[in-house]
Amino acid sequence: MSVPANGNSSRAYLHDFLARAGLEVRPGERVLDAGAGRAQYRRLFAHAQYETADFLAVKGKTYAQPTYVCDLTAIPVEDGRFDHVVCTQVLEHLPEPGRALAEFHRVLKPGGRLWLTAPLFYAEHEQPYDFFRYTQFGLRRLLEDAGLTVVELAWMEGYLGTLSYQARVMSRALPPDAASWGGGVKGRAAGLGARVARRLGRHAADWLADLDRRHKFVRKGLPKNYQVIARR
């Protein structure tokens, strides 16, 4: 069943991607959710042996207690333990992404699959653990250097999803006060314009996110994120 955008088509498309992963995981197979955070997608792998890894270092972030508290460049398991590794919206937070991908290669069984998403366009977050953004060519290079074969590399959301995000940022970032625009008559006019733009931005963000779920345009523009399936 299609998940509605609810103002953020990226989350809906991410759910679709992981639901697809869940369908491809056979009962009893072992799955590692690398950088699992709250392990919010655990239920999609209820039929599998689901394990998690995270480093629990971001202040103020809520975590589910992981199976392994570790750096993703040094996961404390034997070679070839997992049939699938899931790593979503995590790679940008790793200072050595190539080493982490090589570690995923190590812990995957031959023929095992990596389900990966990573951002191209997104504001800094979870500071100070935010290091990179990725083009499709950068992702392919990193994966191949780690010994993984790219099976699929695609936009996660369409360009309308990126525009929705930009509108959402605008609705929060433009200063609404006259002083921020230099004060005086011009400052008051600019502040009024900013308040109108913020309100319009909120509505535009919701509308564009919903539209992105119905019309995923990928021929031009840019995505917020890429999704990748790679094989060991």
Question: Residues of each region from the PLM?
Answer:
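Class I SAM-dependent methyltransferase Rossmann-like catalytic core
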Residues: 1-25
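Conserved short-loop catalytic and cofactor-binding motifs
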Residues: 2, 6, 88, 127
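Short, surface-exposed alpha-helical recognition segments that flank or form part
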Residues: 5-9, 92, 218
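Short gly/ser/thr-rich secondary-structure transition/capping motifs
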Residues: 12-16, 33-35, 67, 209-212
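Conserved SAM-binding loop
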Residues: 19-125, 135-140, 228-230
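S-adenosyl-L-methionine-dependent methyltransferase catalytic module, highlighting the catalytic core
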Residues: 98-99, 103, 109, 113-231
